[in-house]
Amino acid sequence: IYDVLNSLKLKGLVEIKQERPQKFRAVEPKIALQILSNDLLAKLSNIKQTIFSEIEKLRTQDRSLLLEEPNVWIIRNLDKAKQKIKSLIESANVDIVVSSPSSLVNELKDSIVFLTRNRKNVTAAIVCYCDESKVQVNSNEAILLKQRPTPSLPIIMIDGTYCIVFAEDYSLELGEPELMRILSDFFYYSIWRPSKPLTKFKLDQEKTTSHIWLAIEIMKMSKKEDLTVKVNGFERKSRSVVEIEGSIVDYKLDPQGIFKNFTLISNEKKYLVGGLGASVEDIEARLITISKKK
């Protein structure tokens, strides 16, 4: 019985009078309940911190466990959406990819011209759903311009990280990486590839893009042996950040849509470079810079 009483003493639930024999007295019930309650809360707090710590470890190891709100918004005010996209076009740092009726392209004309004249490294690729005579943006702005005789979705992608898709009375604003990857592939296979060129693009200066297919399209318009390409991205297996620069050995943009990649040689080593979500290549490119060799 003394072991039990000593245990209760350690918990602060009994008091001991030091005499022979020892005398024990229970503390007041209100005080005892408070002591037990505090002890239980402390244990629960420790358990909570342990659980949070383990969850954080998992979150850093696997991004699929991140409980973030999807970056998808509906904009009901189309004028507001157009004003926003004009501002984003003018401040683009990497590329703009546009597919729309000529009316919308012409509304965006001033912003597109401002971009191509003030940020000459930014790549602008545009597909118009219209008669080419209605397009007011011309080849003087060094734009990759195409025409599609039948309409599809009006899509505007900025820097490979932001997109607005226009519907009849609303627009979707998207920033989810997986959706951007899907839209980029959709744009290339369903919109860009079936369209006919309206201008003959010439690589006069350095161009950047976040889309692997657009980089290869630019490469196809030049002699690959004349090009220098810099790639910023990730090593596919280790996910370590990489930056490599070298010459083009080959590129692949097959009709079946299975492969979109190019081979780069840098410091006598060959690298197979793919785009966002690369699954078989050595490098997953996020930014591709193409220029003529000096």
Where are these regions (language model features)?
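Basic, Lys/Arg-rich alpha-helical nucleic-acid-recognition elements, primarily the DNA-binding modules
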Residues: 1-37
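Signature of lipid phosphatidyltransferase scaffolds
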Residues: 165-237, 283-291
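Contiguous mid-protein beta-loop-alpha structural module that forms a pocket-lining wall or clamp
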Residues: 42-44, 106-108, 129-191
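Inter-domain helical "communication" segments and dimerization helices
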Residues: 37, 46-71, 80-82, 152-153, ...
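PLD-like (HKD) phosphodiesterase/transphosphatidyltransferase domain
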Residues: 30, 34, 39, 43-124, ...
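N-terminal accessory interaction module
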Residues: 212-294
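Primarily the HKD phosphodiesterase
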Residues: 85-139, 229-256
